[in-house]
UniProtKB/Swiss-Prot annotation:
E.C. code: 2.3.1.47
Modified residues (N6-(pyridoxal phosphate)lysine): K237
Stored Pfam families: Aminotran_1_2
Family recorded in the similarity comment: Belongs to the class-II pyridoxal-phosphate-dependent aminotransferase family. BioF subfamily.
The protein's required cofactors: pyridoxal 5'-phosphate
Superkingdom: Bacteria
GO-annotated molecular function: 8-amino-7-oxononanoate synthase activity; pyridoxal phosphate binding
Name of the molecule in the record: 8-amino-7-oxononanoate synthase 2
UniProt organism field: Bacillus subtilis (strain 168)
EC primary class: transferase
């Protein structure tokens, strides 16, 4: 059998199930109004929560670094890829996250995989939230430790699992801070309380919380007033740049530098990306206006959709999942949205469980009241047309 024939059979099964995906061609910077596949659309699926990815101050910082350092780092940090900008950004992240040190990775995905595949040993166990991001799941799979999954943000189940795993040498509780598909916030205060009681370590992926949650945007740690052992994050969402990081004690960072394969064998992110991210943290620390505007939008949209009769998941975050259920109907809903100039793709299995297909709205501070009015009016009309509300 030719490989294409076999692969086509597998692709056909995905199409029949309504879970086949395609790329969309987008022109211009990541702002709300974009040209997608030749049509003008208002984007409601971007992680650019504070609008910093197109902020002139970040662009200027990156351009200045480009002139001095060029377009790429051209090597691993441990060979020729290290620069003063990498070190400046790591110090900035550690200061922002209130940790001793931080280490950059090429993405948040690689940061999660690097930490979880290198830190726990074979006599250890990882307790992982059921809805953790794929990068955390893959890190657990690559780890030498066993993995036990607990029900999503269910603290009773987590405590039961902690009771059942006391034979292990060390235990690591790993969780997203904000869950990317459900928009829920991990109860980090309760998790850390349990960790102290059962002598476990806590690892938090703060990808969707960094720059967003907490009075100063520090993330879920500030939101709950607690300090996890390890914080992982990305620079590609609210920070508006590229790359990922891990933050914690100086000893932990030294360990990663010597053990995390996704750090050792990766080409470093370009210095220009570091300069842009560094400027983003300066902006986040200096002003709360963008966050305040963002959360006013969140309240407005969540309340309106619930009042229409939609099933809206999640907590008070920029991620608003509107559950449709059937994958085919969800795709149709997304197509009708796009026909009205709204880009919010369908989220289907395997990203979410069967029967949980949804339109995942993400809000940014760059959206306007006109954008919001159009979004809500369109959701109301399509929901009525498809007999969802």
């Amino acid at each position: 059998m030719k490989i294409d024939s076999w692969l086509n059979e597998r692709l056909d099964r995905m199409k029949e199930a309504g879970v086949h995906r395609n790329l969309r061609s987008m022109d211009g910077a990541p702002v709300p109004e974009r040209n997608i596949d030749g049509e003008n659309q208002t984007v409601w699926s971007s992680n650019n929560y504070l609008g910093l990815a197109s902020d002139r101050r970040l662009i200027d910082a990156a351009q200045t670094a480009l002139q001095q350092f060029g377009t790429g780092s051209s090597g691993s940090r441990l060979t020729t890829g290290n620069s003063v900008w990498h070190e400046k950004l790591e110090k900035k992240i550690a200061s922002f996250k209130l940790t001793e040190a931080a280490l950059l990775f090429s993405s948040g995905y690689l940061a999660n995989v690097g930490v979880l595949s290198s830190l726990p040993e074979k006599e250890d166990v990882i307790l992982s939230d059921q809805l953790n991001h794929a990068s955390m799941i893959d890190g657990c799979r690559l780890s030498k430790a066993d993995t036990v999954v607990y029900r999503h943000i269910d603290m009773n189940d987590l405590e039961n699992k902690l009771n059942e795993t006391q034979r292990y040498q060390r235990r690591f509780i790993v969780t997203d801070g904000v869950f990317s598909m459900d928009g829920t916030i991990a109860p980090l205060d309760q998790i850390i309380s349990l960790a102290k009681r059962y002598h476990a370590f806590v690892v938090v992926d703060d990808a969707h919380a960094t720059g967003v949650l907490g009075d100063s945007g520090q993330g879920t740690s500030e939101y709950f007033g607690v300090c996890p052992d390890i914080v992982i994050g990305t620079l590609s969402k609210a920070v508006g740049a590229e790359g990922g990081f891990a933050a914690g004690s100086a000893v932990f960072i030294d360990f990663l530098l010597n053990h995390a394969r996704t750090f050792i064998f990766q080409t470093a992110i370009p210095p220009a990306s570091c300069a842009a991210a560094h400027e983003a943290f300066n902006i986040i620390e200096a002003s709360r206006e963008k966050r305040q505007l963002l959360f006013s939008y969140i309240s407005m949209i969540r309340t309106s959709l619930k009042n229409m009769g939609y099933v809206v998941k999640g907590d008070h975050t920029p991620i608003i999942p509107v559950v449709i259920g059937d994958a085919h109907k969800t795709v149709l809903f997304a197509e009708k949205l796009q026909g009205k100039g709204i880009y919010a793709p369908a989220i289907r299995p395997p990203t979410v469980a069967p029967g949980e297909s949804r339109i995942r709205i993400t809000i940014t501070s760059d959206h306007s009241m006109g954008d919001i009015d159009h979004l809500l009016q369109t959701f109301h009309s399509i929901g009525k047309e498809l007999h969802i509300i």
